[in-house]
Amino acid sequence: MSNTKITFYPVKNGDTNLIEFSDGVNMLIDCKFRSEAEAEDNDDYNVINDLLTNKLTTKKKGLPYLNAFVLTHPDQDHCLGFAQKFFLEKNPEITEPTEEEKESKLILIGELWYSPRVFTEHEDDLSDDAKSFKKEADRRMQLWKTNDSTKDKPGNRIRIIGYSDVDDLNGIPDECITAAGEEISKLDGKNHTQYRFFIHSPFKKAIEGDSRNETSIVMQIRVDADSSKDAGKLIFGGDAEWRVWKKIQEKTSDKKKLEWNLFEAPHHCSYTFFADDRENDPEESSLNFLDNRVGNGYIVSSSKTIKKNRFFVNFGGNISSISVCIK
């Protein structure tokens, strides 16, 4: 059995993170597929080419297969290109992909992770890619609401991150819903023993601050390696600002759920993890969260190169992608 590998793709300020678990299952957290990076005369890293050529080697229905796609929140730098790169709006069990769709290598998503709150509160302020994601989530939810016989097939599965009292979720079975404070090990229709997901947010009630960013999915992923349980503790938080991280610490009684040895800097290493304004002193709660590091922890910034200033030191160099292997 191979080790779990995490690839942070360089998409400037944005997120595209691929987790390849030790059992062969894969998960993509957010996407930013920049069309200009696909041009032959462009030196930017061609993310979609790497995914299709080197990563998504399993096929279903003649399409590259991704076990799970997680959208932390629907800002454009987290879902750019979604509408163009994935097989959407069709039930693959009923409508076979066309030859054109196969030649275009549209990606079939086994299970979609969807947090409905931000979509319902900001429906008029969504990009075309975010609307496309919402439309696909609605299609899958309708299969579960009507108890369609194909609802739990690859390409139709959905995981709701939120609460069942939202109107849109009427009729969705509890098995498809995971709320803040809950842990799951089921992914793409199967229970897994080598890794597990603890959901920290979004919360049921809104908190003060940027209402889009405070609804980001924040989760801890714990993965085993060989005989070591929870050898890797990964935390992803989209664009969650400091108030979210403060409340997470207040609500989490099991402090092991706050531990990390790999932490993606929220909001592309923005000051909003520490304070409302870059001139403000960092909030103590944010500094306390960083103390949850276990061992030789690493923080990854999904951003443009951070230039030297009074807060940061640039360790420099042009990178193709960052890959971390948990052993």
Predicted segments with their positions:
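A short, acidic, amphipathic alpha-helical segment used as a generic capping/interface helix at domain edges
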Residues: 279-292
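Active-site environment of divalent metal-dependent phosphoester hydrolases
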Residues: 13-15, 74-80, 118-122, 241-245, ...
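Flexible, acidic/histidine-containing loops and adjacent segments that form or flank the divalent-metal
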Residues: 2-4, 61-68, 80-241, 317-327
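Short, flexible/disordered intra-domain loops and linkers
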Residues: 35-46, 122-134, 272-282, 307-316
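Conserved beta-strand hairpin/beta-sheet module of binuclear metal-dependent hydrolase folds
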Residues: 2-64, 215-240
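Short amphipathic alpha-helices and their capping/turn segments at secondary-structure boundaries
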Residues: 247-257, 287-290
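C-terminal regulatory/interaction regions
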Residues: 1-4, 13, 279-281, 307-327
